[in-house]
A protein has these predicted regions:
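Conserved "HGTGT" condensation-loop signature of ketosynthase/thiolase-family condensing enzymes
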Residues: 1-78, 97-99
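Active-site-proximal gating segment of KS-fold condensing enzymes and close homologs
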Residues: 78-99
Length: 99
């Protein structure tokens, strides 16, 4: 009997950082005001060249490393997003192809 499970986890955050101090420069607010009300310190933004599948690919590589397996050992990719690369093609297929 086969079993299914999560053997590793991974994440990826884009390099572009926008801090509360950056907000202070463009709108009437402060780091303290934002932080006390939301807990947010910084936000990460993908570049215009990066798609959802690029971010997911970075996370997948970390998950594979965390699981101590090879890319070829991955049997299934489940990727849920509200921001797909394309309307008609799932980002999971793109990540699978990149792996």
């Amino acid at each position: 009997m086969q079993s299914i499970g999560i053997k590793g986890i991974g994440y990826y955050v884009p390099e572009n950082v926008f801090t509360n101090f950056d907000f202070e420069k463009i709108i009437d607010t402060s780091d303290e005001w934002i932080r006390t009300r939301t807990g947010i310190i910084e936000r990460r933004f993908a570049s215009k060249e990066q798609a959802t599948s690029d971010l997911a690919y970075g996370a997948a590589l970390k998950a594979i490393e965390s699981a101590k397996i090879k890319k070829e050992d991955v049997d299934m990719i489940i990727l849920a997003t509200t921001t797909p690369d394309y309307i008609a093609q799932g980002a999971a297929c793109i990540v699978q192809n990149k792996l």
